[in-house]
């Protein structure tokens, strides 16, 4: 024991730390396990003074062992503290005191069951400072008593094993989707049993893919297959959520029964939930797969009269206006009813929500400043909405010779519906003094694409497709090229090269 206490582990600096511990007071140690606690003066406090004034370890042991009726739990920390002070002043105790230290240790071990929790903690702390080994009998006994006083841990609730569809649902319900990469989702889906893939789980998967722009073919094909297999059990409100990622991610599934299945569901459910029906058609519009029969139903007077006055009336009319535009531009063979003119509303009268939410990350202000310095503020329009309601990033009017024309002298809008036959176009050119070309600069920001790919989102591809069919010339500005421009001079040079590639020229007539 002496060798342990005087080893390198018990350095003078460590023992001197005992001097910084304030004297242990009975009132701060709390009641002992048996509930006794000294009050006031008397033999108990007299014994504490004797311990504090002891001149050797033997004297400490004598006061503790010869006064069993007066010794209380708080006296043992006092004795340990005094022992440390004596070891500092007498670094080499005599061989007789080695046995004394062992006896003192055994005395504490025998009586520690009566210590309160606070006394046990103080004794543990002092014993460590004195250098008692961690695997020695004193520290082991004190540590065992400390653990026995801890409140019992509540039994952990039984967590059943999570398999297949349940694990997929847990992953999809987590707000931090990056914790669950697509490989995890694919594996969970592959391990799921057919009965575990409920509509709720598949809707969560579809919403997850659409929200985070994950164009993952394996997962999308699984949704398409589920829709075909469960066709009879699904209503239009569930189907609209299942088909959402296909339109948003511009992905046409390989499942051959996908479109026939949707046409049957639309025929069965079209009059039940008008908004769900139109939402399904919106997704199919982005895929360029509009079924004529469903269009005839939603453009019928009975359907339009049914939605008027209902809460979703405005949003349904906006979607119907977009569907009517798609019929006009993309379905020349359609002969059914169309949306009446009085029911039409602007499709997208302002920048999309995602663009407004991420405006501080957009390159639009930078491009606008470059165009202002390159062309002049009067020679372009920003955020101009053209019929039938598409918001353009930047619009220019260019003469047949390639000169950029001032916007104040031009009508920025092309006629809608566009003139389709050559005779109408010839009549238009002969009666119009300004055959200027309308050029739309399209910003393609990072969030306009599916994640980790070069496929435009369905709504972006639809807008560009319709503007092109209406006669506007499109000039895409990809985010990779914009991000590589360092400073305004480089950006102006980049824009000049882009415009010159379309036949623009700078001279007396233009910018």
UniProtKB/Swiss-Prot annotation:
One of its GO terms (biological process) is regulation of mitochondrial mRNA stability. GO terms for cellular component: mitochondrial matrix; mitochondrion; nuclear speck. Belongs to the FAST protein kinase family. This is Fas-activated serine/threonine kinase. The RAP domain is essential for RNA-binding. Signal peptide: none annotated. It is an enzyme of class 2 (transferase). PROSITE patterns: RAP. It catalyses: L-seryl-[Fas-activated protein] + ATP = O-phospho-L-seryl-[Fas-activated protein] + ADP + H(+); L-threonyl-[Fas-activated protein] + ATP = O-phospho-L-threonyl-[Fas-activated protein] + ADP + H(+); L-seryl-[protein] + ATP = O-phospho-L-seryl-[protein] + ADP + H(+); L-threonyl-[protein] + ATP = O-phospho-L-threonyl-[protein] + ADP + H(+). Disulfide bonds: none annotated. Interacts with TIA1; the interactions leads to TIA1 phosphorylation. Interacts with TIAR. Autophosphorylated on serine/threonine residues. Activated by dephosphorylation. Residues 439-497 form the RAP domain.
